[in-house]
Amino acid sequence: MNIKKVDKYSFLEFKDDKFSLYFSTAENGLNFNINTEEGNDNIRNLKDWFNVKDVGYLKQTHSDIILNYDSDKELLEGDALITDKDNTLVGVFTADCVPVLLYDKSKNVMAAVHSGWKGTSDMIVKKTIIKMKQEFLSTASDITVYIGPHNKACCYEFGEEALSEFEGSGIYDISEIYKDGKLDLEKCIVKQCKSENVNNIKCLNICTNCSKEYKMFSYRRDGKSAGRMFSFIIKK
């Protein structure tokens, strides 16, 4: 992992052949909340900062809607974007939910997924992998998955009354994903990947709520004043 500096801001950077993956931090208050003028300005800046033609993102709704990215002319609702377009960036906004970036070097396809507890219970990452297989002919062994900073099991308190959403999936063992009143979203997502025979999984192991090494936004910690981070993948 590298730290990419852009102006006064810091991004966590990973590179693999033609793919570059970035996770923004809250360093110097870099905010991508699209409900603010500042957030929209920063989204527009990404084209110059990272030298790309198109920037793809969605109006996130905690759904399992997965869309193929075509252009940035219209803001659509959903929580995952897939594309094989060159010189393009696709990403998701988070402030505790899990950003998941996927790519397949063989078929030159990439995806960005926003997986909060609802999206995780609806298995949006698994469904994204299935869509990559069906529509872009990806094979499991060619897919790489990065699980970014989120509210990890050390901090993510979750009410037992909603655990029923995770039962009956056939891949979750509640005793493994839920302990001492806390839910392990990362473990859920890893299980989704492995259920599709995707085993090349990289976990950043950064908690948005309690990380001391990196400055992160956390809605649980900071409330409505929390900014939004942007996690994205580029194919050149």
Curated annotation (Swiss-Prot):
Keywords, ordered alphabetically: Copper, Hydrolase, Metal-binding, Oxidoreductase, Transferase, Zinc
Entry EC number(s): 2.4.2.1, 3.5.4.4, 2.4.2.28
Pfam families, A to Z: Cu-oxidase_4
Cofactor: Cu(2+); Zn(2+)
Superkingdom: Bacteria
Binding residues annotated for Zn(2+), in chain numbering: H62, C97, H114
Record field: catalytic activity: adenosine + phosphate = alpha-D-ribose 1-phosphate + adenine; S-methyl-5'-thioadenosine + phosphate = 5-(methylsulfanyl)-alpha-D-ribose 1-phosphate + adenine; inosine + phosphate = alpha-D-ribose 1-phosphate + hypoxanthine; adenosine + H2O + H(+) = inosine + NH4(+)
InterPro entries: Cu_polyphenol_OxRdtase (IPR003730), Cu_polyphenol_OxRdtase_sf (IPR038371), Cytotoxic_necrot_fac-like_cat (IPR011324)
Role, per record: Purine nucleoside enzyme that catalyzes the phosphorolysis of adenosine and inosine nucleosides, yielding D-ribose 1-phosphate and the respective free bases, adenine and hypoxanthine. Also catalyzes the phosphorolysis of S-methyl-5'-thioadenosine into adenine and S-methyl-5-thio-alpha-D-ribose 1-phosphate. Also has adenosine deaminase activity.
Similarity-based family: Belongs to the purine nucleoside phosphorylase YfiH/LACC1 family.
Subunit structure: Homodimer.
UniProt-recorded name of the protein: Purine nucleoside phosphorylase CA_C1699
Native source organism of the sequence: Clostridium acetobutylicum (strain ATCC 824 / DSM 792 / JCM 1419 / IAM 19013 / LMG 5710 / NBRC 13948 / NRRL B-527 / VKM B-1787 / 2291 / W)
